[in-house]
Structure formats: structure tokens, C-alpha cells
């Protein structure tokens, strides 16, 4: 009797699991679609920074936002691992991160060129180029050393 009862309970449990298969696939696909979405709507500054302090603040804000982007990408990859790995979704997540970095660089490049054109002193221009180059390196690599280099160079430029 115990064996029959155990068999019935086990069969019921397995049939219940089998019935959830299609529903789980729909849920999994919905999660894949959500993880694959990419928002490239990165705000361009409403007004171009007019002085070195404003430009330094702009670069620092963009660096912080890029770090937040990297955090979101990492969390999406972790969620993907929990849901079930899918190569095309992983590629979409990685591509989104790259596209967001490139969009930030493109926006900042336009601002940088405008600030550079308005900078007259050779030392200040050198510090500006150095700070912007360190910012680009940090945005690309997101390493602690690159962050330290960026912070140092942008502080020097801002306080000239």
C-alpha cells in the first residue's frame, strides 16, 4: 500500500512538472526578451559646459553613469545565468553595453571639442586633453586604476 501511495504521489508530482513545461518556456522567453532590451536614450547635456569646472563635473557624471551601466550589464548577465543561459541574449546584453559606452563617448566628444576650442592656454589645453583621455580610458576599461587616473587628471584640470 505504501508503494502504491508513493508511486501515485510521485506520478502526480511528475505530471504536474510536465504540465508546467510550456508555461515555463513562455516565462523564460519573456525574461529573455526583457534582458535583451537596450535603451540607447542617453541624455545629451541641455547646455554645453561653459568652463572647466562644469566640464569636469560633466565628465565625472558621465563616468559615474558608465559605472552604473556596467553594474546593470553585470546584473543582467547574473539574471541570465539564473534563468538559463542563452548565447543570443548574452550577446544582446554585451552589445547593449558596448553601444551605450560608444554613445557616451560620442556625446562627450562633441562637448570636449567645444570646450577645447574655447580653451586658450597651452597648459590648460594639455590638462583638458589629459583629463578627457583618462575619461575615455576609464569608460572603456572600467578598472580601478583607470578610475584613479581619471580622478587625478580631472581634479588637476578642474583646479588649474
Where are these regions (language model features)?
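Sec/Tat-exported extracytoplasmic proteins
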Residues: 63-70, 77, 119, 139-146, ...
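C-terminal motif of bacterial Sec signal peptides marking the signal peptidase cleavage site
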Residues: 15-16
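Long, amphipathic, charge-rich alpha-helical segments that form helical bundles/coiled-coils
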Residues: 92-149
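Immediate post-signal-peptide N-terminus of mature secreted/exported proteins
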Residues: 21-92
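Repetitive helical segments and hydrophobic/amphipathic motifs
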Residues: 11-12
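Short, low-complexity, Pro/Ser/Thr/Gly-rich segments in the mature regions of secreted, periplasmic
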Residues: 149-160
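Sec-dependent signal peptide recognition
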Residues: 2-8
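Intrinsic low-complexity, intrinsically disordered segments enriched in polar/basic residues
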Residues: 2, 19-29, 47-50, 94-106, ...
Amino acid at each position: 500500500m505504501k508503494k502504491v501511495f508513493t508511486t501515485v504521489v510521485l506520478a502526480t508530482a511528475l505530471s504536474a512538472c510536465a504540465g508546467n513545461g510550456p508555461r515555463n518556456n513562455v516565462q523564460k522567453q519573456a525574461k529573455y526578451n526583457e534582458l535583451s532590451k537596450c535603451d540607447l536614450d542617453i541624455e545629451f547635456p541641455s547646455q554645453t559646459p561653459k568652463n572647466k569646472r562644469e566640464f569636469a563635473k560633466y565628465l565625472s557624471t558621465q563616468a559615474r553613469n558608465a559605472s552604473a551601466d556596467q553594474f546593470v550589464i553585470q546584473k543582467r548577465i547574473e539574471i541570465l545565468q539564473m534563468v538559463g543561459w542563452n548565447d543570443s541574449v548574452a550577446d544582446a546584453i554585451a552589445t547593449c553595453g558596448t553601444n551605450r559606452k560608444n554613445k557616451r563617448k560620442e556625446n562627450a566628444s562633441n562637448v570636449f571639442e567645444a570646450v577645447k576650442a574655447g580653451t586658450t592656454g597651452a597648459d590648460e589645453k594639455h590638462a583638458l586633453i589629459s583629463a578627457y583621455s583618462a575619461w575615455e580610458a576609464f569608460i572603456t576599461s572600467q578598472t580601478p586604476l583607470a578610475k584613479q587616473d581619471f580622478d587625478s587628471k580631472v581634479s588637476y584640470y578642474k583646479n588649474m
